[in-house]
């Protein structure tokens, strides 16, 4: 049976974007997978996880795009190794791991790809409720950039779907488990590629999710 609807899925290699992609597939979309290399610390590991997730989803069309200019802009600890990754818990302020306007850049490129590939939707795994407080992960931001994208594209009908935006990390892990998303193929650590540090914001949020879901995380952590 020919699949009549297609979606660009922005897949970082982390568990949130992985779940969003599985939800897209379960909603009947043919996936066009999109991944970005921006010279982040765990770039090679994230790319590896992206391909493993795509393999599990049987995704044929994959795009890995070099957006290294993000590292040239700098101003964040994910690309600038002279800046330390915070290890003192989730802050009320926007942390130095925030990459300025990253999702705005990613979604603009995803919109161009969606138009070229004839996709009616873009799936992205942003989480507002249980996160590090990045301003480009909010529902308000997504709705606003969706309007801008449709003003700037020919058909004006691309929908950005954020199925995780109001979920807690515990809910994300539970739902991923129920959908048989292989979370052991995903990576969250900001700092390391072999053994997750367990103490950066992203690791803390991931571990919090598994604890709330009463499940064990199968990826390796520093002992």
From Swiss-Prot:
Top-level EC class: ligase
Keyword Zinc assigned: yes
UniProt KW keywords: ATP-binding, Ligase, Metal-binding, Nucleotide-binding, Queuosine biosynthesis, Zinc
Record's keyword annotation contains Mitochondrion: no
EC number, UniProt record: 6.3.4.20
Organism domain of life: Bacteria
Pathway: Purine metabolism; 7-cyano-7-deazaguanine biosynthesis
Molecular function (Gene Ontology), one example: zinc ion binding
Residue numbers binding ATP: 11-21
Cofactor note: Binds 1 zinc ion per subunit.
GO biological process: one example: queuosine biosynthetic process
Requisite cofactors: Zn(2+)
Span of the signal peptide: none
Catalysed reaction, written as an equation: 7-carboxy-7-deazaguanine + NH4(+) + ATP = 7-cyano-7-deazaguanine + ADP + phosphate + H2O + H(+)
Family: Belongs to the QueC family.
Record-linked PANTHER family: 7-CYANO-7-DEAZAGUANINE SYNTHASE
Role this protein plays: Catalyzes the ATP-dependent conversion of 7-carboxy-7-deazaguanine (CDG) to 7-cyano-7-deazaguanine (preQ(0)).
Name of this protein: 7-cyano-7-deazaguanine synthase
Natural source organism: Campylobacter fetus subsp. fetus (strain 82-40)
């Amino acid at each position: 049976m020919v699949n009549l609807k297609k979606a660009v899925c922005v897949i970082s290699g982390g568990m949130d974007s992985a779940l969003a992609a599985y939800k897209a597939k379960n909603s009947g979309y043919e996936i066009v997978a999109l991944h970005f290399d921006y010279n982040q610390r765990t770039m090679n590991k994230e790319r590896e996880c992206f391909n493993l997730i795509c393999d599990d989803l049987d995704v044929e069309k994959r795009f890995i795009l070099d957006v290294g200019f993000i590292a040239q802009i700098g101003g964040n600890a994910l690309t600038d190794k002279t800046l330390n990754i915070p290890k003192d818990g989730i802050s009320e302020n926007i942390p130095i791991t925030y990459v300025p306007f990253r999702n705005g850049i990613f979604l603009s490129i995803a919109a161009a790809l969606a138009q070229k590939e004839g996709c009616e939707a873009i799936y992205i795994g942003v989480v507002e409720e249980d996160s590090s407080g990045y301003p480009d992960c909010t529902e308000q931001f997504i709705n606003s950039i969706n309007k801008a994208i449709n003003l700037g594209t020919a058909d004006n009908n691309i929908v950005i779907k954020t199925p995780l935006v109001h979920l807690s990390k515990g809910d994300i892990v539970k739902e991923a488990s129920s959908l048989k998303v292989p979370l052991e193929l995903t990576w969250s650590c900001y700092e390391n590629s072999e053994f997750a540090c367990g103490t950066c914001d992203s690791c803390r949020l991931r571990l919090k999710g598994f604890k709330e879901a009463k499940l064990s995380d199968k990826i390796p952590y520093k002992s």
